[in-house]
Amino acid sequence: MRTIQQITEIQKHETPPVVISNALTSSKVQLLLNYYRNSDKTLEKNTGPKVLYINEGDGIIDDIIAKLRTRFGDFKVRSAHYFDVNSPHIIHNDDDKDLPKCYKAFTIPLWCNGDDDDIGLVMYDQFYYHGPAKFINGETQQSSVHYNQFVREYRNVDYTTSDLIEDTSQITHLREHWLKGLSVYKILPWKIGSILAFESLRLHSSTDFVSKEIDQKIGISIFTTI
């Protein structure tokens, strides 16, 4: 677990999540999609998603990173990958097991087999500073995990609340007891060509896009440190 001093240092740089609309041209989106679809290095996690890891310096996202640095400062990229998913992510953070000085996460929507108006990224008010995790309050059954630990009670989650989330219509894939103690800060629109920027240690999840008859979406995630 991180020390209080380490957490305080991370918190100094926290800012509200934002969406940079129309950050990528349609030709850039297509270029990124073509790279993913033509690659033979895609991996499939035991939890379902397909990923393709990419690196700064490969020339794939270097121009995007450069533009992000002009707005968010001189961060370092600790990991970046394409994701190709057919089910909505549950509540998680985007930490690293080495517990670095985590900074922003950036999500770049590239494609979905439906209307991107029906997809969002849910930002919760809560943070977790103690490693990569998925949040399943109240669960006792064991489940497969690729990298994250499962947090089954929210004692070490910051900013929990006794209030209930009143409108859960967009997160119907999440069990009610998982949401106990959590509150929604904002739902960011998952618009193709935009960039979603948020603190990587903030709890977040997808909306239930499968309920909107969308069963695949592709994008890029970039995780950073300072």
Show where each model-derived region lies.
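Non-heme Fe(II)/2-oxoglutarate
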Residues: 2-93, 120, 127, 132-162
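Catalytic core of non-heme Fe(II) oxygenases with the double-stranded beta-helix
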Residues: 86-203, 207-226
